UniProtKB/Swiss-Prot annotation:
The lineage of its organism: Eukaryota, Metazoa, Ecdysozoa, Arthropoda, Hexapoda. Belongs to the Mediator complex subunit 6 family. It holds the Pfam family Med6. Keywords: Activator, Nucleus, Transcription, Transcription regulation. Component of the Mediator complex, which includes at least MED4, MED6, MED14, MED17, MED18, MED20, MED21, MED23, MED24, MED27, MED30 and MED31. Residues 156-177, 198-249 are annotated as: Disordered. This is Mediator of RNA polymerase II transcription subunit 6.
Amino acid sequence: MASRQMTNDHLRLSWHDTQMMATLSPQTVMDYFCRKSNPFYDHMCNNETVRMQRLGPEHLHNMIGLEYILLHVAEPILYVIRKQHRHNPSEATPIADYYIIGGTVYKAPDLANVINSRILNTVVNLQSAFEEASSYARYHPNKGYTWDFSSNKVFSDRSKSDKKDANSAKDENSGTLFQKQRVDMLLAELLRKFPPPIPPMLQNLQQPPPAGDDLNTARNASEMNNATGPLDIKTEGVDMKPPPEKKSK
């Protein structure tokens, strides 16, 4: 389990050395890979022993244990290095492969990681396809299940759900029936205690108009006044004497 976790961590790593990137060649690529700062390089391998003893790479075939070899070259960009365990000069078991592209070292994924990644992508795509297909399925009691691929159907369902959410939010923000009635009662009480002033123009409009004969009389009087002008009313003196009383014979 720990080795599997370490392998997955190495798949996310990359390494490069800017000092030697420009001078890579089939003769120098192994020295570039075997630098101590490379996290993919195991310092307990046979390559390190050969380097410390200043021997040539051909001596690796006569040794037993872990070693790194140059497997494939595609100059000047790609180099493939294999990590393997040598049992004898003619037999070795591959452990891992590393590739160098443009001076950057990566670990190549093994077959299990490739299969797991492909299966995961397939499952995710199938799940999204089933979810998309289920959104077009419709059920009717008489017809059963049918497909409805009208483009507006899904959008209309989404708009309806959005409207329902908006209405529910409005209902939550509005007050209860008791609160509304209570506010109306308080407003009516305040209006009764503090009535607003009525303008004079509205007071004249509120006076009842003259009824029937009084209205006609008022109209005739106004017409006569307009036609003849103002009338002079003569008044008699207040000192007039009453007629003498008749005496009985």
